[in-house]
């Protein structure tokens, strides 16, 4: 049959007092990536051995390269398959393509992209400068990442 739970006062004792710690505020202020990559953290050379840096860069690069390869292969298959089906439908007479209109739309898109690229140039240059500075300060882990990325693409 069903058992009754004892009243709550039987569980409580004055000897057992616990302090509840709220770590959410600490976690908001102290992100792990600030310790690893933050401006005050200094270059990786000062923190980890060369072997550790190469392994960290190589493993993260391999993961990125492997994912890039798989996603790229999937995207290329989807785009190529869609284009192939469109060509088959066009040659079979199911679809009529107005190539002059396509060319006009492509040229319009090119002009819009050039306008937006000129406006976004300062932000992009700032990001490139920051990335270049990071690579200069952490050349060992960066070279490990590049090597791992290439291995990930090859696997």
Swiss-Prot record:
Membrane topology of this protein: Multi-pass membrane protein
Keyword Transmembrane: yes
Modified residue annotations for Phosphoserine: 13, 17
Linked residues for Glycyl lysine isopeptide (Lys-Gly) (interchain with G-Cter in ubiquitin): 119
Regions annotated as coiled coil: none
Subcellular location: Mitochondrion outer membrane
Record topology, Mitochondrial intermembrane segments: 69-74, 155
Short sequence motif named YXXL, residue ranges: 18-21
Domain notes: The YXXL motif mediates the interaction with MAP1 LC3 family proteins MAP1LC3A, MAP1LC3B and GABARAP.
Name under which the protein is recorded: FUN14 domain-containing protein 1
Organism: Bos taurus (Bovine)
Gene: FUNDC1
């Amino acid at each position: 049959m069903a058992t009754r739970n004892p009243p709550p006062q039987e569980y409580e004792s004055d000897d057992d007092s616990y302090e509840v710690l709220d770590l959410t505020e600490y976690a908001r202020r102290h992100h792990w990536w600030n310790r690893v990559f933050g401006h005050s953290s200094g270059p990786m050379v000062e923190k980890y051995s060369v072997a550790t840096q190469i392994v960290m860069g190589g493993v993260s690069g391999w993961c990125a390269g492997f994912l890039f390869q798989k996603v790229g292969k999937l995207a290329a298959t989807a785009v190529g398959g869609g284009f192939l089906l469109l060509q088959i439908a066009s040659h079979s007479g199911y679809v009529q393509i107005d190539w002059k209109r396509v060319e006009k739309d492509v040229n319009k898109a090119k002009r819009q992209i050039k306008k937006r690229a000129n406006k976004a140039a300062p932000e992009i240059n700032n990001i490139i400068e920051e990335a270049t500075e990071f690579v200069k300060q952490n050349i060992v882990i960066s070279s490990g990442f590049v090597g791992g990325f290439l291995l990930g693409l090859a696997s």
